[in-house]
Amino acid sequence: MAFVAPVSSVFSTSSKSAVCSGRSSFAQFSGLKKVNNTARLQTAEQGSAFGGVSDANDAFFNAVNTMGAPARTSNAPSMKVRVAINGFGRIGRNFIRCWAGRTDSNMDVVCINDTSGVKTASHLLKYDSILGTFDSDVVAGEDSITVDGKTIKVVSNRNPLELPWKEMEIDIVVEATGVFVDAVGAGKHIQAGAKKVLITAPGKGEGVGTFVVGVNDHLYSHDKFDIVSNASCTTNCMAPFMKVLDDEFGVVRGMMTTTHSYTGDQRLLDAGHRDLRRARSAALNIVPTTTGAAKAVALVVPTLAGKLNGIALRVPTPNVSVCDVVMQVSKKTFKEEVNGALLKAANGSMKGIIKYSDEPLVSCDYRGTDESTIIDSSLTMVMGDDMLKVVAWYDNEWGYSQRVVDLGEVMASQWK
């Protein structure tokens, strides 16, 4: 097994990434109807993609079939890397949809481990309450799911050590259960025969490298990292624009609040939970709770270590969240200069990662957004020339899943 560096050793010195620098093109969903991408946000120069907020819901289900495709790297493998997904929940299924739209992917998804069974897994892939119907041919077999003629084996085992990774010659396991998030747990996939593990959650402890695409993914090394984490959806939202602001203005300290849609970790009705606030009904309450996202930003932007903290407010919406960061900076500035720096990054080094909007939109308008973070420029504030407020939206499922696929492509591009 290759040496795996501690989480804290993985950091960024540049905002540019070989993968994200060309993410201006968009792939088409495999098997989905070709429609104009009317629900995507445009940059400030291009204007709004829809005439008004009332059109957003009508446009969404037709527009969700487009997504950012990563730029190809020069050292792409001659054969596709064999991928298995462990856990077929929200992120696992979103991963399949995102991956299916990549016409030039170096990954080949060959197996899914899901304890709900083939019938349920295929049904939930085909029909989704957030994304709508997956307009591809999804067929449930006896022990497989076929998507537009591509057959993916389905197994069911809760013990990673007993999964058939060796016999199936699995290269990368996308660990999407939310359970095996440390080196010991994720390492069981390697013991079972896989070569690498990509965790779709914040990694815990030593031996897991944390990467945020567009911020520090250029530091990934095939020889150095066996287990990597794609961090959290909120860290993926915060880290890109916080790096831009830190580079440009010098962040002294900051506090963040993410107003976050409810997740499967909460309770539909009041029921037991280790967090007594999360024990309360997600559909009826604003639920204050913890988030490690602010501190985790320092794992990929080390100049921000010890400078950020924050909380989460879980709200009764099923998807899309918004991050509000108030910070003190060392360089005097004003609103237009702050927005200018963010717009420049959105159109340049972080194109496809940061999106910039000057439209008065709401959360539903951002469903299906490919980018990790969408700057709401009209909400930017500057107080006394050194205190900033920046507000950024993010699709905590779809945008995050796009980055999981991107990070998988980074790993696959270095395969030996």
UniProtKB/Swiss-Prot annotation:
Q: Where in the cell is it found?
A: Plastid, Chloroplast
User: Which keywords fit this entry according to its UniProt record?
Assistant: Calvin cycle, Chloroplast, NADP, Oxidoreductase, Plastid, Transit peptide
Its chief place of residence is: plastid
Question: Pfam family of this protein, just one?
Answer: Gp_dh_N
Cysteines paired by S-S bonds: none
Q: Extract the InterPro entries matched here.
A: GlycerAld/Erythrose_P_DH, GlycerAld_3-P_DH_AS, GlycerAld_3-P_DH_cat, GlycerAld_3-P_DH_NAD(P)-bd, Glyceraldehyde-3-P_DH_1, NAD(P)-bd_dom_sf
Claim: Signal is one of the keywords in the record: no
Q: What class of enzyme is it?
A: oxidoreductase
Where does the chain bind D-glyceraldehyde 3-phosphate? Answer: S232, C233, T234, T263, R278, T291, G292, R314
Query: What Enzyme Commission number(s) does the record list for this chain?
Result: 1.2.1.13
The domain of life is Eukaryota
Q: Where is this site: Activates thiol group during catalysis?
A: H260
Which pathway does this polypeptide act in? Carbohydrate biosynthesis; Calvin cycle
Instruction: Give the signal peptide range.
Output: none
Q: Which GO terms describe its cellular component?
A: chloroplast
Which residues are responsible for catalysis?
C233 (nucleophile)
**KW NADP (keyword) present:** yes
Q: What quaternary arrangement does the UniProt entry report?
A: Homotetramer.
Listed name of the protein: Glyceraldehyde-3-phosphate dehydrogenase, chloroplastic
